[in-house]
Amino acid sequence: MASTSVAAAEVKAQTTQAEEPVKVVRHQEVGHKSLLQSDALYQYILETSVYPREPEPMKELPRVTAKHPWNLMTTSADEGQFLGLLLKLINAKNTMEIGVYTGYSLLSTALALPDDGKILAMDINRENYDIGLPIIEKAGVAHKIDFREGPALPVLDELLKNEDMHGSFDFVFVDRDKDNYLNYHKRLIDLVKVGGLIAYDNTLWNGSVVAPPDAPLRKYVRYYRDFVMELNKALAVDPRIEISQIPVLDGVTLCRRVY
């Protein structure tokens, strides 16, 4: 979701034998370029372990999203696979997603949850969500989704007023406005249950977190970099959570609430 690393277009993969013809393979058409140093290694992961197991609705949604001018904001196939498996491992049932875009990560979550599972999904743009909604409906999982259009902070504040909502969420995925990540964390830590997970996307922010101050960065990358770095520092010392920062795509930090 709201994620702005460089989109990987369809490219020609070189074969190991120089005399063999160049073969066109499927690359991550939309989404983020991997932080792996080798594009060939990333492509190997996709072709070997991700695409063969990707459900048909999740193959279709990127094709539809590719027509959108901001298609690079979508979650990638390998991250979607990672999230789906993670949800099953923790037996998640009640989840939340902040930042939906066209719904790739949302669809991955919905497919992973049991039939009576629920997702509170929030995004400021309903039009983007409507692009993927027909595919979500066709997949038979739309009934699991409670979509709210608008800023997430007022919704979170309203939830916090209800004591019954404290500790009620098994899993939260955050992939929206990076300048509000810390504001989200201050609220989500009370809404997720002890033992539950919060996943923050883009915590390596296109690798810019290690770029020198005078590095030539895109304007939006430079603007949000400081907010991402501030979040990373805060999560690293928060005693209420255990964390693991994983270099999946643009970086995902998992936070497990311990008290």
Swiss-Prot record:
Molecular function terms, GO-annotated: caffeoyl-CoA O-methyltransferase activity; metal ion binding
The protein's matches in SUPFAM superfamilies, at most eight in alphabetical order, are given as: S-adenosyl-L-methionine-dependent methyltransferases (SSF53335)
Top class in the EC scheme = transferase
Q: What is its EC number?
A: 2.1.1.104
GO biological process: one example? methylation
Annotated keywords: Lignin biosynthesis, Metal-binding, Methyltransferase, S-adenosyl-L-methionine, Transferase
Q: Where does S-adenosyl-L-methionine bind?
A: T75, E97, G99, V100, S105, D123, A152, D177
Its function, per the record, reads:
Methylates caffeoyl-CoA to feruloyl-CoA and 5-hydroxyferuloyl-CoA to sinapoyl-CoA. Plays a role in the synthesis of feruloylated polysaccharides. Involved in the reinforcement of the plant cell wall. Also involved in the responding to wounding or pathogen challenge by the increased formation of cell wall-bound ferulic acid polymers.
Metal-binding listed as a keyword: yes
Q: Which cofactor does it need?
A: a divalent metal cation
Q: Corresponding gene?
A: CCOAOMT
Any idea which positions bind a divalent metal cation?
Answer: D175, D201, N202
- Report the source organism: Pinus taeda
PROSITE patterns noted in UniProt: SAM_OMT_I
Pathway(s) annotated for this protein in UniProt:
Aromatic compound metabolism; phenylpropanoid biosynthesis
- What is catalysed by this protein? (E)-caffeoyl-CoA + S-adenosyl-L-methionine = (E)-feruloyl-CoA + S-adenosyl-L-homocysteine + H(+)
Q: How is the cofactor bound?
A: Binds 1 divalent metal cation per subunit.
Query: Into which family does the record put it?
Result: Belongs to the class I-like SAM-binding methyltransferase superfamily. Cation-dependent O-methyltransferase family. CCoAMT subfamily.
Keyword set includes Methyltransferase: yes
Residues that hold substrate according to the record: K33, D175, N206
Protein name from the UniProt record: Caffeoyl-CoA O-methyltransferase
